Amino acid sequence: KSVAKYGPPVYVRHEIVHYKYVVDSLKNIGAIFVEELDEIEDKSRPVIFSAHGVPKIVPTAAINYKMEYIDATCPLVSKVHREAENLHKANYHILLIGHLNHPEVIGTMGQLPNGSIDLIQTVKDVEEYKNRNEKKIAYITQTTLSVDDTKNIVDALKMKFPDIREPVK
């Protein structure tokens, strides 16, 4: 819809979804995929943020560049971002179950100040995690991981931290 509204090219920060057919279709109608905003030569063109979400600094950078942006963050990802913010405001330290360098993890971790969220990828990470005297700990998960993908990690977290706060359903 953005290409129809604005005409090509429309820039997209990261592949908007992990689905080659969709990405190729968008390229064919004038979408140009970039990793960072500074790769966009014509800042008068709009940019779309992918369904995975982006760190808070990205919309700020777009505003500073005077770029129009469209936030296509998946509603489920936005829910995780809001939950992270609410937990942070309630003085929880947050553990994010996810995969290092996944765009969604980067976006979620970028919602809060550095050090507010620690990434947990494996049961071994749980075993090695040192609680830095946080009074309250909560966990959230990357939305693209299934309950089966995270079950062993969640079980390990609950064993290590019996009072850990679970995500809002």
Locate predicted features.
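The feature marks the mature, well-folded catalytic cores of soluble enzymes
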Residues: 1-169
